[in-house]
Amino acid sequence: MKTLYRDNKGLHRWLFACGAVLVLFFLFRGNRAAVNYWVYSVTLPFEQFLGRACAALPFSVAELLYVLAAVTAVVLLVLMVRYLIKSRQKGRAAYRCALFVLDLFLTVCAAFSLLWGANYYADDFCDRSGLSPEPVAYEGLVRVTQYFADHLAEASTHIARDENGLFTADRQEILNYADTVYDCLYDEFPFLDMPDQKPKGIFFSKIMSAMNFTGFYFPFTGESNVNMDSPAMLLASTCAHELSHQRGITSEQQSNFLAVLACTRCDDANYNYAGWMLGYIHLGNALYRVDPDAWQQIRDSLPDEIVLDLRYNSAYWAQYKGLTATVTQSLNDKMIKSYGDELGTQSYGAVVDLLVNYYA
């Protein structure tokens, strides 16, 4: 055993260092004051620095790192198989390879926990704003759903449509506007006031669609990344959602709420439409579960072109329903829950409580 440790001393020290970081993280995550200091005074400024540095490049550094990681994984697998075949001491060689892989995995876990996982235990948007997603009454849900449907219909008159009657817009223009979309919220929520880095479109967006993702925030580069292949009608609200993560907000319900609020209040027609659309979709889904007839009545009041957009969006995502999307969303759900968010990906639906309480 001593020989095994001595022969792999560096890998063992690496393992112990990662383990120590993770142990300290789990010990201190319950100390709200310490976590708040770490998040808002250390990691958030650091991620903003990374975001500014990466903003100078016209492509997503996060996507590049994912590609490099995939290529590196294949190369390492080939090298390790070759090493195991040539080694005379198969057991020791296998142990060394397994230890190396474990070290890499724990390094990523430790870094992710420090840069992003800690945010789950810091004061969130609701803590800092005083808003709370209290359970809502049926009457409030119906009233706010109708309110969003009415404003969605109005917003629809100010956007462009293609020859098929579907929403159309220059996607790059939507991305370019994103760094000003939160300006309208700073008076009400001054703690949100910080420089934004524009979201970046992902080149391999179809892969994101297969995984059922419209966007993601990458803490290792401070970049917000968005799917450029999915229906354009919600691209603006996706941008606003991902920009909330640049502010250290981890809760998906709070990010969706902020996306709706910022989009509907800003002075860009494409963002207005996406904001009212995102809110209506969440509210409508919640209403349908409790009263399909009330949902149908509101749905029937929508102009035909909005219904066309909704059907196109549903048809687009229907083609990607399968094992890949199921597995990916399951892993994402488990990751979110591992950091104490009991709702997991279900928290995307809890935005309804915030919307109804705010607009009722």
Model region roles, listed by residue range:
Residues 58, 235-256, 260-261:
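Active-site recognition of the HExxH zinc-binding catalytic motif
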Residues 139-143, 148, 250-294:
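Post-HExxH zinc-binding segment in Zn-dependent metallohydrolases
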Residues 5-19, 96-101:
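Alpha-helical transmembrane segments and their helix-start/interface "positive-inside/aromatic belt" motifs
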Residues 305-360:
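Pan-zinc metallopeptidase signature
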Residues 117-187:
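Membrane-interface segments at or immediately adjacent to transmembrane helices
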